[in-house]
Amino acid sequence: MAEHPTQFRDHHELAKLPWFDLEGGELVVDPSIGPAIDVHTHLALSYVLPTRLDLNREWPRTEHYLPLERPLDLDVYANRNFSAEDLKRLEKDLTLGAVTASGMRRTHTLPNLAREMRGLSIKSSVLLAIDFALLSDNAGEWLAAARGKPEFVVFGSVHPYRPRVAAQLDRQLALGARGIKVHPAVQMILPQDPLAMRLYRLCGERKLPVLFHCGPVDIEPPLGRYFSQVRHYRRPIEKNPDTTFVLGHSGALQMEVAIELCKQNPNVYMEISSQSVSNVRKLLDEVDPTRLLFGSDWPFYHQAIPLAKLLIATEGREELRRAVLYDNAARLLGLAPSAA
């Protein structure tokens, strides 16, 4: 098995890996690698005011939160690649920018995501909405924007403290939602909060998987870091055996604890975005291979970053690669199996 570099001067140097190339300055992958399903993406999030962005507008260049010209290390947790200035811009774009139609977020649209997907043989991307109890409807706006676009699967968002939670779930389900996203650090709620526990039960009754942001990432505010501690997810998982849970980022910086949760509970999947090459290898070796999912956290990161990590980690293990890239997610989401 060949040794591959994991450190690059910029994102475009990923083309040094045997699976990638550059076409017109854009990273592309050997088509034989696909298809893939990315279960962890976002569009521009809007709060307080309805979105002022056109989510169906194409921009010439996507402004990822980790700029493409930034040096890239694949064998650290992904956010370690941010500079201090990158983090300042990210925070401003996600807070003050969330009420505007400007900033980096204006490029976080369906056509820009679709363009990246095409070059990387990603057949489907799951859009993960995040909403507050009041003053946001990202789920409704994304469901409307993605209507008639089969390459996109939308996970809705219902804050546990929102009135008429069951009716809101049914509304989003009727509009095409295929699951629900829960982000304790952003929504400011403990995973085991009684109202959150009710939400998980209702999701299980409707066969809607719950994708958690799971684990601390060390760049969030202290309270958000506390809410994301993996120990807080045990009770929701164990008390809702009929609900399927996906641990986004595989527990982030507490991956070992998340691995044990997955081993002990058959209703848990692990999603690998942001983990290092070494940690992806560990997940492949220790977790049930039918419960591992590929994800990117676009637009924080270019989709080629986690793809490169997985391709390095699965070299010589093509059946496992196919399962993680596509088959496991297709089965979970009810999508067509791959032809491979």
For the regions a language model picked out, list residue spans one by one.
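Mid-to-C-terminal alpha-helical segments outside catalytic/metal-binding sites
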Residues: 1-35, 49-104, 108-115, 289, ...
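Active-site gating/metal-coordination segments in enzymes
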Residues: 12-18, 119-212, 216
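Acidic-and-aromatic substrate-binding clefts and catalytic sites of carbohydrate-active enzymes
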Residues: 102-107, 131-137, 159-165, 187-194, ...
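Active-site neighborhood of phospho(di)ester-bond hydrolases with catalytic His/Asp-centered motifs
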Residues: 36-41, 127-128, 155-157, 181, ...
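Ligand-binding grooves and catalytic loops that recognize ribose/phosphate and carbohydrate rings
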Residues: 167-177, 187-199, 217-220, 226, ...
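Catalytic pocket-lining loop regions of alpha/beta-barrel enzymes
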Residues: 15, 19, 178-182, 189-293
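Histidine-centered divalent metal-coordination motifs
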Residues: 40-46, 213, 249
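Conserved, mostly hydrophobic/aromatic
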Residues: 40, 117, 172, 180, ...
